[in-house]
Amino acid sequence: MSDNSKTRVVVGMSGGVDSSVTALLLKEQGYDVIGIFMKNWDDTDENGVCTATEDYKDVVAVADQIGIPYYSVNFEKEYWDRVFEYFLAEYRAGRTPNPDVMCNKEIKFKAFLDYAITLGADYVATGHYARVARDEDGTVHMLRGVDNGKDQTYFLSQLSQEQLQKTMFPLGHLEKPEVRKLAEEAGLSTAKKKDSTGICFIGEKNFKNFLSNYLPAQPGRMMTVDGRDMGEHAGLMYYTIGQRGGLGIGGQHGGDNAPWFVVGKDLSKNILYVGQGFYHDSLMSTSLEASQVHFTREMPEEFTLECTAKFRYRQPDSKVTVHVKGDKAEVIFAEPQRAITPGQAVVFYDGEECLGGGLIDNAYRDGQVCQYI
């Protein structure tokens, strides 16, 4: 059995059960483990409680229980500059961003990794549900987590080969109930702590109220694609393509009582387009354009790829043909897809392996751009 005691692994600890068990497993495997709590957002909940302070207390309790040193590091400036400014800019542009993808790329596997290296880390580890496989030549492949419902490779798709070579995902071969069971058996104080939901810096807050603190809302007209006025919308930034709830219009406005969905946006005229039916024609597209396209392994500057893709988290894979040119790609769907949303990630897979991905710029229906921003 190899001696892991000379290998230092710095674990990103959030105060949740996943990162707690990550640290526990590495400690049990004999690694030299250090726990780091990242404070990325100055956050207070509705009751005036700083949730980061509460989470840090949980990190301290777990680190003490399993016998590892721990530190807290503040990345609020890096987070604001690299993630939150991007988040706001995307909403200003009428898009629907995915800050978790950018947070992993810029904070958890860049700012945090850089800091860990100053502590002498050989690797960093997180509680993500993903796996890494290492070839003899050192090339790292990122694989889906075995818990299909928890697999987080979608959010890790922008990681580079260099970042992956320094990364361990100890939970990738486990299912979530097994992780909780390990925490309970070890008596960890976080064993029954509920999972966090929502965007990291918003937490459980009301999204509309949160966003309006940073971007002024601009109400405008809500229209059907054939020109009927359906009333006022609260501001384009509050709606995403394919959204059903929150429109304030019921089935009585249409002839068939089918539910209403957001089917388009016109940023220049501040119009929100709505239509009836889950598979409304305006929601269906046959291809997309992506930018910031990136692969986890070295690829040619220009190539074509047959693979599968996800266009949102937890979506089943769809067959696609990808034409890559530099950091841009045209992605052609084998079957029409619903509600392809500019700003979201498109992520490519070859079987179990996550190959990388990009950010969706536009969706197309038979060569015509969809009115999604």
Swiss-Prot record:
Residues reported to bind ATP: 12-19, 38, 127
An annotated GO cellular component: cytoplasm
Protein's cellular compartments: Cytoplasm
UniProt site (Interaction with tRNA): 128, 344
One GO biological process term: tRNA wobble position uridine thiolation
First-listed, main subcellular location of the protein, grouped into a coarse class: cytoplasm
Record keywords, A-Z: ATP-binding, Cytoplasm, Disulfide bond, Nucleotide-binding, RNA-binding, Transferase, tRNA processing, tRNA-binding
Intrachain disulfide bonds: 103-200
Signal peptide range: none
Domain of life: Bacteria
Chain segments carrying region Interaction with tRNA: 150-152, 312-313
EC number: 2.8.1.13
Active site residues according to the UniProt entry: 103, 200
Region (Interaction with target base in tRNA): 98-100
GO MF term list: ATP binding; tRNA binding; tRNA-uridine 2-sulfurtransferase activity
Catalytic activity: S-sulfanyl-L-cysteinyl-[protein] + uridine(34) in tRNA + AH2 + ATP = 2-thiouridine(34) in tRNA + L-cysteinyl-[protein] + A + AMP + diphosphate + H(+)
Role according to the record: Catalyzes the 2-thiolation of uridine at the wobble position (U34) of tRNA, leading to the formation of s(2)U34.
Record-linked NCBIfam families: PRK00143.1 (NF001138), trmU (TIGR00420)
UniProt similarity note: Belongs to the MnmA/TRMU family.
The protein's name in its UniProt record: tRNA-specific 2-thiouridylase MnmA
Native species: Streptococcus pneumoniae (strain ATCC 700669 / Spain 23F-1)
